[in-house]
Amino acid sequence: NPASMKSSLDVLAYADTRKVAILGDMGELGADELAMHREVGAYAAFKNTDVLVCIGALSKDMAEAAKETVLATEKNMKVFHFDTKEDFYQNMGQILKENDTILVKASHFMEFPEIVKKLSEEA
């Protein structure tokens, strides 16, 4: 849910290294789901996240809101959107750097533990 995502971004903000948030769709939000995804995207920019990777159909709105916030506030955050985890895997070598602090979070149905496993294998 959005509160959990924001709390996780709050914790990530304390990292001394480059901050990367890999976020996915949040499920079961009802009629406000697009607005809630946008809210999280904007929040990531305000929390000085260095890189935001959004994965999933609903997370496209998260990425768009983050990009809009970056432009409006002149924040220095890179934003990426991928439709699938597999699309992200093909690009993660160009996005992630050694010593990044990485937050991985999404609703359970997105099966993001797979991403954590993939990151561990690549480390």
PLM regions with names:
Residues 1-123:
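ATP-dependent carboxylate-amine ligase
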